């Protein structure tokens, strides 16, 4: 029996907050898991320290599925972002340990590689259409084959996805939540213009993506999807609030633009209808928020039966530990579609040294045993936690709205 003898939570803020779980076994092997929940980090810290770690000590680190079921079924209050993020951290760390003991990169334990690398997309944004296209050209020069485009909307003081620091977008900030302003009518007039200009400027050989970030009703989303059809988007993301599964049926009736959703999903029940009825094309659920590698592989297998591909969330609110875990997952599932890749800051990369690398539009997890990522605890300690909130959104008349 390979006993878990220690588990600790490490919180660090090398530019933004990250929560890491580190598990140690009786033979001295360690594994790491990401436990970051953007804007609610300390809730997961408490859940791990107060409710999970006491139950982890003494368990067999080899029994990953059993440990997963113990914490999922045994909690009674199943699911939810806090519990599933904490469970994902445990799951990642145990897979890291198992692959290290096997002396091979995790993707080999998951069935081996289904492809040579993982195609990723970057984020191009700007205050104007021209600025966004200029940023997109930079990604093309770096070899990206897929690029998400976001631009400022005329008449609105701020827009989701647009930041001053182009490569390292981070919406969360300190003190109290920033209040943004939204206008659906202004946005719907502007978005098609962005993609008309982008397709003309960037050509037909690059995949273009766009994130609505839950801002539309189903009929509005159907209209937008129809308007964007001439520009052949790879996907339209989060067109409506993700919990509105039935709403995607109405969108499907009005457009052939591919649809993606799911970064806030924590279990298959959040997307069962979407998958079974083929109401989406890409599932954005993450290793981190969907209960870890163990659970996401089950969801992906179910999606594969219905011709739905994966498109995991991969913004900078996930640490390099999740990025590494996602790449092992991506490389090993047959229905992989695309992986989001927002580059971390140099400070973050220093705290989380990793084996994964980028080349010609693709990431590869590397050949190091385990996840191929670690945490420099001494360096992490130099970046203490800083309270931060995600923004909130209001309509122009002051009504609270979806951010």
UniProtKB/Swiss-Prot annotation:
Domain of life: Bacteria
UniProt GO molecular function: magnesium ion binding; mannonate dehydratase activity
Residues annotated for Mg(2+) binding in this entry: 211, 237, 263
Ligand binding (substrate): 38, 123, 263, 284, 313, 317, 340
E.C. no: 4.2.1.8
Protein's UniProt keywords contain Metal-binding: yes
Family of the protein in this entry: Belongs to the mandelate racemase/muconate lactonizing enzyme family. GalD subfamily.
This protein's name: D-mannonate dehydratase Caul1427
